[in-house]
Amino acid sequence: MSDNLCGGLPPEICEQLNKEEQFIKIKVEKRRYGKEVTIIEGLSGSDVELKKIASELKSKLAAGGTVKNGKIELQGDHRERVKELLMKMGYPESNIIIIE
């Protein structure tokens, strides 16, 4: 996070404020051959930060996935579990929306 956006606040507080401002949408799409893909959108940050979050989610869910166009895509239907993991990462529950 850039220091000038947080007005001299410590980096930890700045990071938490940034997480509280994000509205995250979690949805599942059906792809070819009936395969399901969980898509997480609304996370702001650089590609490196998104890849770090995706990597952590993939290892905890034992699933493959990728980062494309600012969205995290995970193989399989992991909506509820992803919400739990994002809350453990510090994202507020009220900002995480599961789209059915």
UniProtKB/Swiss-Prot annotation:
State the coiled-coil residue ranges: none
One GO MF annotation is: mRNA binding
Q: Which family does it belong to?
A: Belongs to the SUI1 family.
The record's annotation in PROSITE patterns points to: SUI1
HAMAP family linked to this entry: SUI1
Q: What is the lineage of its organism?
A: Archaea, Thermoproteota, Thermoprotei, Sulfolobales, Sulfolobaceae
UniProt keyword terms in alphabetical order:
Protein biosynthesis, Translation regulation
Give the matching PANTHER family.
DENSITY-REGULATED PROTEIN, DENSITY-REGULATED PROTEIN HOMOLOG
An example Pfam family from this entry, by short name, is: SUI1
Q: Name one GO biological process term.
A: formation of translation preinitiation complex
Q: State the species of origin.
A: Sulfurisphaera tokodaii (strain DSM 16993 / JCM 10545 / NBRC 100140 / 7) (Sulfolobus tokodaii)
What is the protein's name according to its record?
A: Protein translation factor SUI1 homolog
